[in-house]
């Protein structure tokens, strides 16, 4: 069964997207060995990125979310594309903090709110990425993403995200939903939507009780006669490769490659998102760089 759905109200004025991201967050926890609080923080960001990525119009488009709040967890990053793949990382995955007075994990303090949320959109039809940036509201992720839509894209949006972590640090459930109002929404529709969402249990309560993204849609859009537009599977999937990593090294330029070679001719690159390791002989890379440079020079100034 697909873990993400997109829906629309009967009159076309309200868009809904919901996801059960439990398996995504479980894989992230396994890869990064996160503490409970960091699992919640990174899991929320991955879930939010998944929801945003589902709105991309082209499979080759990408969104990168970067949260730098000055908290002990450090910088959090999540990347997603139009095909349902998402990946993420966190600077300090082992940071743990006391729970808040209500017993909830203190994600806001771990992330911090003295900083910014940066949203980078790579659109294949544009030469340069579009970058939006807003101050963090709380560091709790959902409020910060909602604020981004309000101030950077001027789209009335509600986003709810949740990650439930067990005592053994395993992920019991994770997910979220996003509701957006299209132009022309009436005050009555806005009031009804607010009442619906305020009356809903939390995302983790719903998922832990066996509810689905479609169930969340029916609750959030009660009275709007929503219909499911489409559904698909979302996965934690890193797109790194030996070839892409080699191209990244070559792009550093000859001087940097020489400096690195002089320190150690054997280079190991570790992916931040999946911890895959790639080994390179820098002498061989320098030879390849020189061959490419010579070929480029010959193409620019061919021998007559």
For every predicted segment, state its role.
Residues 198-304:
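Cys/His-clustered metal-coordination modules, chiefly Zn-binding fingers
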């Amino acid at each position: 069964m697909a873990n993400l759905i997109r829906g629309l109200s009967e009159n076309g004025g309200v868009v809904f997207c919901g996801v059960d991201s439990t398996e995504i967050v479980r894989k992230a926890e396994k890869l990064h060995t996160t503490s409970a609080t960091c699992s919640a923080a990174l899991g929320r960001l991955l879930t939010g990125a998944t929801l945003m990525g589902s709105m991309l119009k082209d499979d080759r488009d990408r969104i990168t979310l970067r949260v730098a709040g000055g908290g002990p967890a450090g910088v959090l990053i999540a990347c997603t594309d139009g095909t349902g793949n998402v990946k993420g990382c966190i600077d300090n995955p082992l940071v743990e903090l006391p729970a808040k007075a209500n017993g909830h994990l203190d994600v806001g303090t771990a992330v911090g709110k003295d900083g910014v949320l940066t949203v980078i959109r790579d659109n294949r039809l544009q030469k340069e990425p579009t970058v939006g940036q807003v101050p963090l509201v709380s560091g709790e992720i959902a409020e910060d993403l909602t604020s981004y839509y309000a101030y950077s894209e001027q789209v009335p949006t509600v986003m709810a995200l949740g990650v439930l972590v067990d005592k053994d640090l395993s992920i019991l459930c994770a997910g979220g939903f996003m509701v957006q109002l299209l132009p022309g929404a009436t005050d009555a529709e806005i009031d009804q939507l607010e009442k619906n969402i305020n009356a809903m249990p939390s995302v983790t309560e719903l998922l832990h009780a066996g509810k689905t993204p479609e169930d969340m849609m029916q609750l959030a859009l009660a009275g709007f006669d929503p219909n499911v537009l489409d559904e698909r599977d979302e996965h934690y999937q890193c797109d790194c490769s030996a070839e892409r990593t080699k191209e990244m090294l070559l792009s550093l330029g000859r001087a940097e490659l020489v400096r690195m070679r002089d320190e150690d001719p054997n280079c190991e690159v570790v992916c931040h998102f999946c911890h895959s390791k790639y080994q390179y002989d820098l002498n061989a890379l320098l030879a390849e760089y020189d061959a490419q440079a010579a070929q480029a020079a010959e193409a620019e100034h061919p021998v007559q």
